[in-house]
Swiss-Prot record:
UniProt record similarity statement: Belongs to the tubulin family.
Naturally occurring in which organism (per UniProt): Euglena gracilis
Keywords: Cytoplasm, Cytoskeleton, GTP-binding, Magnesium, Metal-binding, Microtubule, Nucleotide-binding
Cellular compartment(s): Cytoplasm, Cytoskeleton
Record protein name field: Tubulin beta chain
Cofactor(s) the record lists: Mg(2+)
Short name of any one Pfam family annotated for the protein: Tubulin
An annotated Gene Ontology molecular function: GTP binding
Role this protein plays: Tubulin is the major constituent of microtubules, a cylinder consisting of laterally associated linear protofilaments composed of alpha- and beta-tubulin heterodimers. Microtubules grow by the addition of GTP-tubulin dimers to the microtubule end, where a stabilizing cap forms. Below the cap, tubulin dimers are in GDP-bound state, owing to GTPase activity of alpha-tubulin.
């Protein structure tokens, strides 16, 4: 069975990650008392995320943080028992929102013990498919130490997939002033070392939580939303499905150029907890919701860019034919939003088991050039501070060089212009609506 090793780093990563395990355990039928589900569908691929230990306990992830606080609350939580105690790796100092501490000073002291646990988990796999890391890019541990871990794992397992769920900070919902620094330095690493990055914007979650889920503070809503997406992205891996059944297939279908592996993710239906049982959704409704900018988890409007590729994962009992028709329908009606030099660029898959409490749902992953808006915004904030060298002493004090900041900045700007280049790729034919005739002339 092709396993995925799950790692959660830093406070945000651990909050999202532990919620993810609650959702997954619920679906796979692993209760807190550790009795695995009895239906064959639940058990068939349970090993993708779980490994069996003595007494039939199913023990998943690796948790790491530079301070013990979050770990303690995870351990005390309802699912704290399903984690193996030696998979909690934590320091005592904390990174204090400082990327340099996570990456260069505090992080490296802890990294070897994390890698030992990673090795131990990887060795117990029959056929390791890859790693998934949940972290945020705005803090110190998830961003600094998270990217350090990613590069170390890259060295040791160069041919395994590396997927990250990265929470990208936003100007509206900001925890720390130095977020632009931390984010830019992290993106610099993720461009080089990750295979697939699911970008989750803080601000977008805020916007979703407010109107649709009727939550005023995005705390509970956050993790639930993100874990809905994580569970949707990985449901093909956990339950028998028809298409995109592993991380590598996902990557092959979604990444036309190696550096452009930052994805927008969305989820449908988004309803508040109370109102979800009153209406059944149809496949067309799901499709429409799924492509709606309001359902995107990153603060980029897909309408401002074009889709290079996209992948839609439907869950529940529905006809595959209907799904395919809907997908074609979307492409035909909105052809200007899809680049015409990649024909059939939406992949769809259907998995028979819907998430808990819903008849059917859809998870959407899109490689859209509009994601550059998010990087642009961070980059502008970065430049504003870096020009005055504000807060820089915290980083240089940990042994960093200004050169590294300049490199990270230009790497991120390159990324933005690459997205822009492919967005404009066939700008001549855009003028009229008779694109088809134009294409024939060229």
């Amino acid at each position: 069975m092709r396993e995925i090793v799950h790692i959660q780093a830093g406070q945000c990563g651990n909050q999202i990650g532990s919620k993810f395990w609650e959702v997954i355990s619920d679906e796979q039928g692993v209760d807190p008392p550790d009795i695995p589900g009895d239906s064959d569908l639940q058990l068939e691929r349970i090993n993708v995320y779980y490994n069996e230990a003595t007494g039939g306990r199913y023990v998943p992830a690796i948790l790491m943080d530079l301070e013990p606080g979050t770990m303690d609350s995870v351990r005390a939580g309802p699912y704290g028992q399903i984690f193996r105690p030696d998979n909690f790796v934590f320091g005592q100092t904390g990174a204090g929102n400082n990327w340099a501490k996570g990456h260069y000073t505090e992080g490296p002291e802890l990294i070897d013990s994390v890698l030992d646990v990673v090795r131990k988990e990887a060795e117990s796999c029959d056929c390791l498919q890859g790693f998934q890391i949940a972290h945020s890019l705005g803090g110190g541990t998830g961003s600094g130490m998270g990217t350090l871990l990613i590069s170390k794992i890259r060295e040791e397992y160069p041919d395994r997939m590396m997927m990250t769920f990265s929470v990208i900070p936003s100007p509206k919902v900001s925890d720390t002033v130095v977020e632009p620094y931390n984010t830019t330095l992290s993106v610099h690493q993720l461009v080089e070392n990750a295979d697939e990055v699911m970008c989750i914007g803080n601000e977008a979650l805020y916007d979703i939580c407010l109107p649709t889920l009727k939550l005023t503070t995005p705390t509970f809503g956050h993790e639930t939303l993100v874990s809905a997406v994580m569970s949707g992205v990985t449901c093909c891996l956990r339950f028998p499905g028809q298409l995109n059944s592993d991380l590598r297939k996902l990557a092959v279908n979604l990444i036309p150029f190696p550096r452009l592996h930052f994805f927008l993710v969305g989820f449908a239906p988004l309803t508040s907890r109370g109102s979800q049982q009153y209406r059944a959704l149809t496949v067309p409704e799901l499709t429409q919701q799924m492509f709606d900018a309001k359902n995107m988890m990153a603060a980029s409007d897909p309408a401002h860019g074009r889709y290079l590729t996209a992948s839609a994962m439907f869950r529940g009992r529905m006809s595959t034919k209907e799904v395919d028709e809907q997908m074609l329908n979307v492409q035909n009606k909105n052809s200007s939003y899809f680049v015409e030099w990649i024909p059939n660029n939406i992949k769809s898959s259907v998995c028979d088991i819907p998430p808990k409490g819903l008849k059917m749902s859809a998870t959407f992953i899109g490689n859209n050039t509009a994601i550059q808006e998010m990087f642009k915004r961070v980059s502008e904030q970065f430049t504003a501070m870096f020009r005055r060298k504000a807060f820089l002493h915290w980083y240089t004090g940990e042994g960093m060089d200004e050169m590294e900041f300049t490199e990270a900045e230009s790497n991120m700007n390159d990324l933005v212009s690459e997205y822009q280049q492919y967005q404009d790729a066939t700008v001549e034919e855009e003028g009229e609506f008779d694109e088809e005739e134009d294409v024939e002339q060229y």
